[in-house]
Amino acid sequence: MGNQIAVFIDFENIALWAEQEFLDFELTSLVEYLQARGNVALIRAYGDWSRFSRYREDLMHNTVDLIQIYSVRAGKNRADIRMAIDAFEAAIQRPQLDTFVIVSGDSDFGPLVVKLREYGKYTLGIGPREV
């Protein structure tokens, strides 16, 4: 059956980075790249979707589960915490998932990656070069 891939996108972070660099976030090419390497069984994107409504169509076209994270205040991104919990929960509840892709514009996910690897999962981080 090949690799069973789970993708977790810190959308708020990556979209803001792309906008600062005058880039447009386009998910289809990433999904096609991953599909060539296995079955993309799960894709979740985390953010305040009232702020990123222009991306919804592309995300839904790629069967992404949109996880609403309300922006309460500036500071620590609540999406990071929720995304890490969901990824680890998926690793435990769905042991057939063997590859975890973390798409983010920051480096807050190091502890998650270490723990996923302890559980025998292959991890791939995708983000800006400077992260």
Model-derived regions: residue spans:
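Non-catalytic, usually N-terminal nucleic-acid engagement modules in DNA/RNA processing proteins
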Residues: I102
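Domain-level signal for Mg2+-assisted phosphodiester chemistry and nucleotide/NA-binding surfaces
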Residues: M1-I92, L112-R117, Y122-T123, R129
